[in-house]
Each structure stands twice: as C-alpha cells, then as structure tokens.
C-alpha cells in the first residue's frame, strides 16, 4: 500500500571493514556492496509492519585491528542499528561477534573465514561464504592430486585468518603425503621477506603456502623473483586471491605460479554474477576486489528476515534468520544450525597473463 511520508521509518544497517591502512581496498569494495544493496532496496519501496522503510548504511572503520573492531561494534550497538554486515578479517570479526551477541544485533560476514567464528553458537552470528576448512583443504587436495607436489614450505602472518588457513592446509597436505619442509612466520604489516624466503630457498620446496593477505603476498612474489625463486609456486586462501595482488606484484614472474582459493563460485558461475558485476563496475569502476557480491547479499538476507518477521526489530526478526532461503547473487543462501552457510562452494584461481582466471 501507499504509506504516507510520515509513516516512513529509517532503518540503519551497519557495515564494518578496514577503510584505512593496507587493507582499505577490501574494505571499500565491501562497503560498496552494502551501499549498492541499500540503493536497490530503497528503490523497491519496502513496507514492513505497515511502514515504508528507508534503509541507511552506517559505515565504520575497524582498520583490521581487533580492539578497534570491538569498539566500533559497540558504537553500532549504541547507534541502534538493526543489523550489521561485517567484518572483513577473522581477527576483528571474532571478538566483535561477542559484542553483537551481547547487544542482540545480528551480523552477517561475507568475508571472515576462520571456522572459530561460529564456535560459540551465538544466535546473532552468520557467515555466507565457505570457511577456511574448505579453502585450506581444497588447496591441499589440488597441490597433491592435480599438481603432484612433494615438498611445500608454509608461511603465515599470525592473524586469526592467516594462521588458521595455514594450519588447515598443512594438516591436509601432510595427510595427503606432502612433506612440509619449513614453517616460517611474519606479520600482516611486514614488507621485507628476504630472510624467511632465503631460509625456505635452502629447503628447495615446490611451493610456498602463504596464510595472509595480498599486500604481503605481492611483495613476497617480487622478492621471490629477486632470489631466483620465480619457479616456486605460491598457494594461498581468499586473502591473496585479489585483483590488487597483480598491481602489488608489479610484473613479478612468480605471479604466474600463484594458486589461490576463494569461497563461492566464480562470478561467471554465480546465479546473478555477470549482470551484477556489470552494474557494480558502472558504479565503482576499478574498485572490485572479492567480497562485494557477498556483502550485497548479506544486506538482502538481513532485510529478507525482517520481511518474513514483519518487523525491523532485531529482537523479533533475528529468530527468522535460521530459516533463510534467499536466492542471492552469489548462491541460494540457507544456514546450518551453527550459522554457517549450507553447501558452500569453493573456486581455485591462477593468474594467467596477469589476469585472475578460474581453474575449475
């Protein structure tokens, strides 16, 4: 029905990701996904509980820092948002999830992949992408079965994400008969990897698995070239599986040996992927990274639960999230009792002629 202007209710949806620092390119892409969803929702003139709803995004920057992550989560609780899309990093999402649970606001991440996120069993925590158990294992199977690799070195950045995905890869690879010849550690701020790469080179591995993000992986690829290691493959999870790594690696030969995994189908195989991407690129040229289709879907999943509950009150509509069966851009989204996505897909990619290309 035609709800009159005074019957319009503003409903705020929070978004959190690093909007500053070395991971801001992911954060911007995620924020774009939510902004685009909100624009599309507002064009639909959604009516819930007899009121015309105007959705607004409240964006916060967690700078990929766990302390800042919990602080902005509390800020969103205080701002009375109806739901949150975020965060990007497992290291910020896991502590923030407790804050959202305590204040009774549901959050959906389309990016944080550490399996521990859903362990506490909060009724407010949901993930709409494959977790690291799927990513790390998928990469190890490919290394062993398709590439028949024998010796692999492992490096991780000691974050919840990097350490987690590296551990799963290592466990699965060892079970498949791959020898882990060296294990080294770095940080998510490091730029110089010459010492650890030199140590690894002495062990003569077929590949390096890197648990971490693209800024470090790209610099590592350049330094591998300098050390005459451009024939050593680099494996990694979704954190390195970006368009940005091509720029960061700036012509490194070693980029040709990268194999990375992402949760979900490739854009071309997503139900609404191709049309959605064209629309995104028209709005935000050159900003696409990885997760914006997921943050777009996450926004719609929250609103879909509000519609089914006929309420925008988190205390009321959160109970409808477990029954989600939402046909999104990325896939049809339904949840396990834990809040994990049902039937998650993963896709492996390589970089052919400087372009990110799906392997399967």
Identify the role of each PLM range.
Residues 5-360:
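Extracytosolic ligand-binding ectodomains
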């Amino acid at each position: 029905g035609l709800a009159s202007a005074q019957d319009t209710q503003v409903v705020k949806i929070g978004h959190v990701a690093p909007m500053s620092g070395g991971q801001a390119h992911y954060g911007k892409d995620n924020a774009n996904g939510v902004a685009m969803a909100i624009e599309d929702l507002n064009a639909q003139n959604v009516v819930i509980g007899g009121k015309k709803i105007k959705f607004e995004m409240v964006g916060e920057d967690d700078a990929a820092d766990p302390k800042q992550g919990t602080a902005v989560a509390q800020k969103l609780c205080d701002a009375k948002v109806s739901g949150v899309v975020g965060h990007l990093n497992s290291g910020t999402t896991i502590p923030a999830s407790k804050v959202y649970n305590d204040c009774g606001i549901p959050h959906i991440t389309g990016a944080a992949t550490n399996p521990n996120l859903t362990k506490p069993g909060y009724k407010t925590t949901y993930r709409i992408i494959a977790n690291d158990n799927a990513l790390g294992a998928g990469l190890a199977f490919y290394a062993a079965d398709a590439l028949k690799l024998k010796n692999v070195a492992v490096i991780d950045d000691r974050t919840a994400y990097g350490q987690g995905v590296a551990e799963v890869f290592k466990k699965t690879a060892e079970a498949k008969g791959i020898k882990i010849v060296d294990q080294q550690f770095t940080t998510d701020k490091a730029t110089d990897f010459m010492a650890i790469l030199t140590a690894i080179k002495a062990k003569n591995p077929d590949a390096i698995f890197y648990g971490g993000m693209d800024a470090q992986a790209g610099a590592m690829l350049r330094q591998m070239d300098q050390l005459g290691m451009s024939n050593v493959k680099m494996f990694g999870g979704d954190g390195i599986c970006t368009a940005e790594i091509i720029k960061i690696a700036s012509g490194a030969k070693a980029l040709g040996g990268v194999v990375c995994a992402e949760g979900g189908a490739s854009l071309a195989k997503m139900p609404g992927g191709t049309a959605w991407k064209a629309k995104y690129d028209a709005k935000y040229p050159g900003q696409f990274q990885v997760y914006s289709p997921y943050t777009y879907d996450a926004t719609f999943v929250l609103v879909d639960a509000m519609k089914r509950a006929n309420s925008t009150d988190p205390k009321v509509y959160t109970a409808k999230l477990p029954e989600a069966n939402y046909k999104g851009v990325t896939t049809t989204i339904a949840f396990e009792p834990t809040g994990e996505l049902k039937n998650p897909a993963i896709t492996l990619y390589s970089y052919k002629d400087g372009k990110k290309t799906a392997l399967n």
